[in-house]
């Protein structure tokens, strides 16, 4: 399963790089491939959701179906880092069409010194609920060049 996720992540990063317009490169610890995680019975468990934050200022989120290699893009957009704890995502494409065009300020912090665990907090569009997400960096260590 992890191998499939790494291959899919590499594929989408490569496709994004080829098709992306020339943009100013973003230098940030946010850049990378992230897998959503949560706790189940007190244990950390990865979920089949990937977020790719690219250095060209774009991001994408996808759901990977269990048991096969297909998946579904759930959202695409751009992001802008406001400061060392807030960035904004602007959603350009979303599987829920009413989300398209929204700009969402997101609080972020790293839960560890190695910057491998990312915590995101944001409000829903109506401002009535705060969502908190945990993301684990997918490492490319050990992959031969």
Provide a role label for each language-model segment:
Residues 11-12:
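Repetitive helical segments and hydrophobic/amphipathic motifs
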Residues 6, 15-74, 88-145:
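Lipid interaction determinants
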């Amino acid at each position: 399963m992890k191998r499939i996720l790494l291959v899919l992540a590499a594929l989408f990063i490569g496709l994004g790089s080829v098709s992306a317009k020339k943009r100013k490169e973003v230098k940030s610890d946010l850049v990378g491939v992230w897998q959503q995680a949560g706790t189940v019975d007190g244990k950390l468990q990865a979920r089949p959701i990937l977020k790719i934050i690219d250095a060209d200022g774009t991001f994408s989120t996808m759901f990977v179906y269990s048991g096969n290699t297909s998946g579904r893009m759930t959202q695409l957009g751009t992001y802008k880092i406001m400061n060392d704890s807030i960035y904004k995502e602007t959603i350009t494409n979303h599987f829920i069409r009413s989300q398209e065009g929204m700009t969402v300020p997101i609080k972020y912090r790293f839960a560890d010194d190695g910057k491998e665990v990312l915590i995101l907090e944001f409000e829903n569009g109506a401002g009535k609920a705060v969502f908190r997400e945990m993301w684990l960096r997918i490492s490319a260590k050990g992959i031969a060049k």
